[in-house]
Amino acid sequence: MKTLSEQQRVSIVDASTAGILKNMPAAVAEKDQHITDALHALSQIHIVHSANQVNRKRGDSQPQSIDVATRMVFAGGTCLSKAYGLIERMSEDIDIKIVLESPPEGYAFPNTLGERGRLKALHKAVEDALTGLGFQFVVQVDKDNPIRRDGSRYYCLLVSYEAHFQDTAGTLRPQLKVELICRPPIIPSEMQSLGYMLEVLSGSANPFVFSMNCITVAETLAEKVLSLLRRCA
């Protein structure tokens, strides 16, 4: 099962002792390490499917087939925290918006490949990426894991890691919830740099940084306001 390395554990203890974590418990820094590792793994996933030219004629200079991407965009409150540093909170949720690119005019996918097939290919890649890091599926007695709804347009996976630090408040579970929703952003996404919270707080001279497609702040805030209005209606 995925757990911190000895060096990572020592770094968190040292940071806590030095007051670098401020009032945050060590379990928060630990969970951020695992969330960041999971996000990095997701950022490395590249899913494409071939679309073939329709009614191709002899001598046509256009390519016979082209690759069409299935993209992931990091979203939600955790994105506001990790990508933009706008909120200071810990979440076990990794919210992802899925963008299914369409073939250009004159091209089409094989009849055997539909939206559900493209989504399932992405879900399988996500599962392989996370289990490859050592995360394990959470076994739930009363629920399936992962959960798929709406023709696989909604997908939710719970994975666990081995916790070294205990959260005395009991609010942090050694789990991550990864939600993928097939709903493209309205505003074009942005590439943002992500890294470990501990390295940011400690001012590391050589931090681990990677890039990931992220939803814009404006769209995230609009979604939060809309969600609040629906709850109050």
Regions from the PLM with identified roles:
Residues 1-15, 94-105, 192-200, 219:
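Short, compositionally biased low-complexity segments
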Residues 1-61, 108-114:
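N-terminal regions immediately upstream of nucleotidyltransferase
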Residues 16-19, 100-102, 229-232:
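Short, histidine-centered active-site or binding-site loop motifs used for metal coordination
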Residues 25-32, 115-123, 215, 233:
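Generic detection of long, well-ordered alpha-helical segments
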Residues 36-40, 123-233:
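Catalytic cores of NTP-dependent nucleotidyl/adenyl transfer enzymes across multiple folds
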Residues 43-104:
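Active-site nucleotide-donor binding segment shared across nucleotidyl transfer reactions
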Residues 83-87, 107-111, 191:
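Short, conserved acidic/polar surface loops in the N-terminal third of protein domains
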Residues 98-141:
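Metal-dependent nucleotidyltransferase catalytic core
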